[in-house]
Amino acid sequence: MSKFKVVTPKGASFTVAGSDYSYEREALDPIDAEIIEAPANEAEFIAAAKNADAIYAKGIPITKTIIDALESCKVITLGSVGVDSVDIKAATARGIPVTNIPDTFIEEVADHAMMLLLSGFRRLVEQDKMVRTGRWSDRKSVV
């Protein structure tokens, strides 16, 4: 029996462990799956993904053309909140489920938004420049 084949576009990666897919391997190693990085242009991606069991979609749109070329795909998965980069109608027509991670990075995004609000309100960038140029005593005009 051949290995379960996961094809993903080369380049963009959501993994924080580098490009070795350490986190993905935790889930895929028990089923003896292989991850194959394919070129990101559509024609070459199709050639590499034609016999894939799964597509890990990232970095390129997964179009109807790509989906229609998949001969044995069982799932298209995204490591993101949205699924707008995948032609859902085409995948549904082929009976291929599309999955995502609806709560990925939500705490980090909320933290970042609050940090930006506070830094804007307190004029953090402007005050940082003043401190670095020795103009700390001018801070009252900023606050």
Residue spans of the language-model regions?
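Phosphate-binding beta-alpha-beta segment of Rossmann-like dinucleotide-binding domains, i.e.
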Residues: 94-96, 102-143
